[in-house]
Amino acid sequence: MILDHVQLAGPPGCEGEARRFYGDLLGLDEIEKPEAMRASGGVWLTLGTQELHIGIEDPFTPARKAHPGLRVDPPELDTLAERLASAGAQVEWDDRYPGVRRFYTADPFGNRIEIGAPAG
């Protein structure tokens, strides 16, 4: 068994903001949704061999505790944190996970995102 994808929700009409945040800021690549699923809206993206799906939820409630944890190479972590902060996203560093440097941020819809790298 492998993890195929993670889904987060966004409010109706969030696709443009999702593309900017996950694509332009985080560097994920958008993939085409199957034709039969396009009418429901949302955006699908890839992270290496896994996928991140942003689905539409109405009424929408952001995931403030449950979250995906993204891993980057150590040299990328500070650069990514700076890019997010410069774009107005909150970056909250957390040193409680031994052997990992990480921070939390939120997408434009309030969904919590963890981004980390091996320490040292």
Annotated model-derived regions:
Residues 87-120:
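Vicinal oxygen chelate
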Residues 18-23, 84, 110:
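Conserved active-site tyrosine of GNAT-family acetyltransferases
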Residues 27-34, 88-94:
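Short secondary-structure junctions
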Residues 1-2, 61-65, 96-97:
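Short glycine-enriched loop/turn motifs at secondary-structure junctions
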Residues 1-19, 68:
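N-terminal beta-strand motif that seeds the catalytic metal site of vicinal oxygen chelate
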Residues 41-43, 66, 99-103:
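Short beta-strand micro-motifs in enzyme catalytic cores
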Residues 66-84:
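Mid-chain, well-packed structural core segment of small domains
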Residues 29-63, 112-117:
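Conserved short beta-strand elements that form part of the metal-binding/catalytic scaffold
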